[in-house]
A protein has these predicted regions:
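Membrane-embedded alpha-helical bundles of multi-pass enzymes
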Residues: 1-162
């Protein structure tokens, strides 16, 4: 139960930090509950399929985050005037899968190389994922982490004031 709570807290922090809700400060802590959940499962849990547990809970986190931040897609209309379920479902499920797969790569790498190298790898793999996500056919830049500061350009362009 505590793993689900940690995953939900992480999803909540991601969602609240988004420009729609306007508290970008929370993005700095959004991965912490997810990383704690992964650490608890990999080190202390008696779960037999730890990799599946980490994948499933990270998918839950990213699914909730995607749902909250891209829920506006439900207003997309079909040519006949009805709401398009596919406009929500495809990005929601696909993007959550890509994000949780990236987190799963971190889990596997950390299992082999240890926590320190795993965390360094996590930063590298997440940045690579976001870069890749900007440059392929199914680009979906809406949920890149840097977008939380879109309403606060002074925060990210601090060097212009120097």
């Amino acid at each position: 139960m505590k793993y689900i709570i940690l995953a939900a807290i992480s999803a909540l922090l991601f969602s609240v930090s988004w420009p729609t809700y306007g508290v970008p400060f929370f993005i700095f802590f959004a991965f912490v509950p997810l990383l704690l959940m992964e650490q608890e499962i990999s080190k202390f849990s008696k779960i037999k399929r730890k990799g599946w547990a980490v994948f499933g809970l990270s998918y839950f986190t990213f699914f909730i985050w995607n749902l909250v931040t891209t829920g506006w897609l439900k207003y997309k209309k079909n040519p006949d005037g009805s709401n398009s379920l596919l406009a929500v479902a495809i990005p929601l499920f696909a993007n959550s899968l890509l994000m949780s797969s990236t987190f799963q790569l971190y889990y596997w790498y950390k299992k082999v190389r240890g926590t320190y190298f795993g965390l360094v790898f996590f930063v590298a793999i997440w940045l690579s994922f976001e870069r890749f996500h900007l440059s392929w056919e199914f680009t979906w830049p809406w949920l890149n982490l840097g977008n939380v500061f879109s309403e606060y350009p002074k925060v990210i362009q601090w060097y212009d004031t120097i």
